[in-house]
């Protein structure tokens, strides 16, 4: 699919398979989510721009590469998105964090927004929006709508699983936002869950129903 990158690294796929298993414990699911988020972060940041900086090693001065521009923003769609943040922040501890409170009404499958907090100068930053699941796409669309209202121009979306229906819906509204995912699954069921999927990521991460 155009505009979609499937991250098929063997370690990503191995960990994702264990996360899919219904017998995987809450603690195990949470640990795997942290580990896989670090691997996914490598891929979604692969083409960040570098600039040269004059530094001094214990032996001599050199020109060495360093990230250019303002700090990245990781924008978590609450609550499940927070599960991806920990591993990503271990890799990029200087990143700024945005929280976007959007939940899916289980009757209408439409997003309901209840919270938004973001750093300043979004128009000068790369914003990586994170949510484990791209199902209908409605929540991620609403979150990115809000970020664009606040000036964000350079946005990427990172998830574990995506449904074809969600990808089409998402890119129908935000064709300029590339999607990075570990898997494109088969379809959505009548309740809007990704099949075969891994269940409700938030519930499995926090041990709730």
UniProtKB/Swiss-Prot annotation:
GO terms for biological process: UMP salvage; uracil salvage. InterPro entries: PRibTrfase_dom, PRTase-like, Upp_B, UPRTase/APRTase, Ura_phspho_trans. Pathway: Pyrimidine metabolism; UMP biosynthesis via salvage pathway; UMP from uracil: step 1/1. Signal peptide: none annotated. Its cofactor is Mg(2+). Uracil binds at residues 194, 199-201. 5-phospho-alpha-D-ribose 1-diphosphate binds at residues 79, 104, 131-139, 200. Its EC number is 2.4.2.9. Allosterically activated by GTP. It comes from the Bacteria. It holds the Pfam family UPRTase. GO terms for molecular function: GTP binding; magnesium ion binding; uracil phosphoribosyltransferase activity. Binds 1 Mg(2+) ion per subunit. The magnesium is bound as Mg-PRPP. Keywords: Allosteric enzyme, Glycosyltransferase, GTP-binding, Magnesium, Nucleotide-binding, Transferase. It catalyses: UMP + diphosphate = 5-phospho-alpha-D-ribose 1-diphosphate + uracil. Gene3D superfamilies: 3.40.50.2020. HAMAP family: Upp_B (MF_01218_B). Catalyzes the conversion of uracil and 5-phospho-alpha-D-ribose 1-diphosphate (PRPP) to UMP and diphosphate. Belongs to the UPRTase family. This is Uracil phosphoribosyltransferase. The lineage of its organism: Bacteria, Pseudomonadati, Pseudomonadota, Alphaproteobacteria, Hyphomicrobiales.
């Amino acid at each position: 699919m155009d505009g979609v990158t499937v991250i098929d690294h063997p370690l990503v796929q191995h960990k994702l398979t264990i996360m899919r298993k219904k017998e995987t414990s809450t603690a195990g699911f949470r640990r795997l989510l942290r580990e896989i988020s670090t691997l996914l972060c490598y891929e979604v940041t692969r083409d960040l721009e570098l600039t040269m900086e004059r530094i001094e090693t214990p032996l001599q001065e050199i020109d060495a590469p360093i990230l250019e521009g303002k700090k990245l923003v990781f924008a978590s769609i609450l609550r499940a998105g927070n599960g991806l943040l920990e591993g990503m922040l271990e890799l990029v501890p200087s990143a700024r964090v945005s929280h976007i409170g959007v939940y899916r009404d289980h009757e209408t499958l439409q997003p309901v927004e209840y919270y938004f907090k973001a750093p300043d100068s979004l128009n000068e930053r790369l914003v990586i929006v994170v949510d484990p699941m791209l199902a209908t796409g409605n929540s991620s669309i609403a979150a990115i709508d809000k970020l664009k209202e606040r000036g964000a121009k350079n946005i990427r979306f990172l998830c574990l699983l995506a449904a074809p229906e969600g990808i089409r819906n998402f890119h129908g509204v935000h064709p300029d936002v590339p999607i990075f995912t570990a898997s494109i699954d088969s379809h959505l069921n009548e309740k809007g869950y990704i099949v075969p999927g891994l269940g409700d990521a938030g519930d499995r991460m926090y041990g709730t129903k």
